């Protein structure tokens, strides 16, 4: 039984002025002081990527593939598990439909509603379509996912995590993974079975247990659900992604990514490194109307040297028990023009599990993997039960490298409310140095616990109508004047499939 998220935030009047760090919410004035080296800086705001007026559409069908299996518990007889019977016939349909602009449609027939497959490759100008009522299950045979060449062994712990193909590999541009919606709201489902025991793995344990074991050293070689590299205009729409062994979605080094109206349903505890939606080295990204619970980041933007991530919008996305909406830790290629608005974060998943790294909005990096992160705007953000509502650090690891220094500039938080904060709770504001401070504006930010980390340092902050003021070594605070906007009045929706128009975001009142 999933826990209902019916919590509500009470509307409060606008509080004038700002509050001392760690103090109870009571009006106080901010005495403007000049920023080092000149007058107070002005922070521009991100525009992100433009949202389409209408959601993506379900494509026409090129070929239909009918289910031949059924299961009540997500498992199949031994011979079926050892040699998944649907890989070849689904891939044959995908190969035949490549370039058509149409879909290979997986459909239930009578009592048969399941497919069992190893890695699939979606070519250019085609889509994999999973009908509501049908479930595509991932093989648990590690050998099915093994990549060729001098790489790690899939299903093993190794020094690298490069041994496994994903279940679904985006192998061409203008492609996607799409589901249909049943009258009761249920979506077509792709189930990674991360909880199931691996066949032909290093140990007699599940994918998730292998990930937990890798904490003590090495990296887990588990398959992702959806992965793409160097492909443009990828659409992931109206599909339920469940229990991934590793990342749910990683799309990298392309232009044009839309993730719209999906549900990611994986527990917050015991499912290590099961990130939700990860765009890496991507340009023109839209992530909208999604419901996400998993064992790592809800959304995480990253970049490698020479390949920036830029022009992205995250809108009407709701996160449960995750590690937050994050940027980093790799930021070496730079990240810019990222807009996050009308989002909510609950520190607990629908099963009642508390996040294992309970963050709200987070920018993290470290020397050796850092770059310039600038023009990032958060608007109308709601949180409940979040341990670290605001988390900004260029020292995410203990690296002492003098190359690829993290720099965070033009970070704006305009409209944020956090309630139900656990104990202890703290926020972190940290820049790299006095010459490379964190530049941040906080407007209309109200937390029910304003405690800050003792690591706070090197910050230039502008503040208006907020009850948290960064404080610490080499921290300068100036008044932002009267910034247009307001503290959000919030209702966090219960976790479940997003409705056709997207889940209700925090209302702008």
Regions found by a protein language model. Give the residues of each.
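Short, T/G/N/S-enriched strand-turn elements that build extracellular solenoid repeat scaffolds
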Residues: 91-97, 114-124, 139, 176-179, ...
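Right-handed parallel beta-helix
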Residues: 132-133, 173-188, 232-242, 255-268, ...
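Short edge beta-strand segments in beta-sheet-rich domains
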Residues: 15, 272-274, 437
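Residue-level marker of regulatory loop/turn positions in helix-turn-helix DNA-binding domains and
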Residues: 82, 218-220, 228, 251, ...
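Short glycine/acidic-rich loop motifs that flank beta-strands on beta-rich extracellular proteins
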Residues: 102, 116-117, 138-141, 193-196, ...
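Extracellular beta-rich repeat passengers
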Residues: 351-509
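Extracellular "leader-to-stem" segments immediately downstream of a signal peptide or signal-anchor
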Residues: 2-230, 237, 246, 258-262, ...
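Short strand-loop junctions, especially beta-strand C-caps/beta-turns
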Residues: 109, 302-304, 328-330, 364-366, ...
């Amino acid at each position: 039984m999933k826990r209902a998220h019916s919590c509500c935030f009470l509307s409060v009047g606008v509080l004038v002025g700002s509050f001392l760090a760690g103090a109870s919410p009571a009006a106080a004035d901010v005495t403007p002081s000049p920023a080092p080296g000149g007058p107070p800086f002005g922070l521009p705001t991100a525009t992100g990527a433009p949202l389409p007026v209408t959601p993506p559409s379900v494509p026409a069908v090129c070929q239909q593939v009918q289910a031949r299996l059924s299961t009540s518990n997500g498992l199949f007889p031994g011979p079926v598990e050892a040699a998944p019977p649907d890989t070849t016939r689904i891939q044959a349909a995908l190969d035949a439909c490549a370039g058509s602009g149409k879909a290979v449609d997986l459909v239930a027939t009578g009592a048969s509603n399941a497919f069992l497959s190893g890695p699939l490759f979606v070519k250019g100008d085609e889509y994999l379509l999973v009908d509501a009522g049908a479930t595509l299950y991932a093989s648990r045979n590690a050998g099915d996912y093994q990549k060729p060449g001098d790489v790690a062994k899939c299903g093993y712990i190794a020094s690298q995590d490069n041994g496994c193909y994903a279940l679904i590999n985006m192998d061409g541009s203008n492609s996607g993974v799409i589901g249909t919606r049943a009258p009761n709201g249920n979506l077509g489902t792709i189930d990674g079975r991360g909880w199931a025991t691996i066949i032909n793995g290093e140990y007699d344990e599940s994918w998730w247990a292998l990930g937990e074991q890798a904490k003590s050293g090495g990296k887990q070689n588990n398959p992702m659900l959806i992965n793409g590299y160097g492909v443009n205009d990828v659409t992931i729409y109206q599909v339920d992604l469940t229990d991934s062994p590793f990342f749910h979605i990683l799309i990298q080094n392309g232009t044009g990514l839309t993730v719209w109206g999906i549900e990611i349903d994986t527990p917050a505890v015991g499912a290590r490194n099961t990130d939700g939606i990860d765009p890496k080295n991507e340009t023109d990204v839209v992530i909208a109307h999604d419901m996400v619970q998993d064992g790592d980041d809800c959304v995480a933007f990253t970049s490698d040297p020479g390949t920036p991530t830029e022009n992205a919008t995250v809108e009407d996305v709701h996160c449960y028990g995750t590690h937050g909406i994050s940027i980093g830790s790799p930021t070496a290629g730079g990240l810019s023009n990222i807009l996050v608005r009308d989002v909510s974060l609950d520190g607990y998943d629908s099963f009642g599990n508390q996040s294992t790294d309970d963050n709200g909005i987070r920018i993290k990096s470290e020397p050796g993997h850092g770059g310039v992160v600038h023009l990032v705007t958060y608007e109308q953000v709601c949180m409940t039960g979040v341990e670290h509502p605001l988390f900004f650090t260029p020292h995410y690891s203990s690296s002492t490298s003098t190359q690829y220094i993290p720099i965070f500039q033009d970070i704006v938080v305009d409209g944020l409310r956090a309630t139900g904060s656990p104990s202890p709770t703290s926020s972190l504001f940290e820049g790299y140095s006095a010459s490379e401070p964190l530049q941040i504006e906080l407007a209309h930010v109200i937390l029910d616990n304003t405690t800050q980390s003792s690591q706070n340092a090197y910050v230039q902050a502008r503040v208006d109508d907020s009850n948290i003021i960064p404080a610490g070594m080499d921290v300068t605070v100036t008044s932002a004047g009267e910034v247009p906007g307001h503290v959000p009045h919030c209702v966090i929706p219960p976790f479940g499939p997003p409705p056709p128009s997207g889940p209700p975001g925090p209302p702008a009142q």
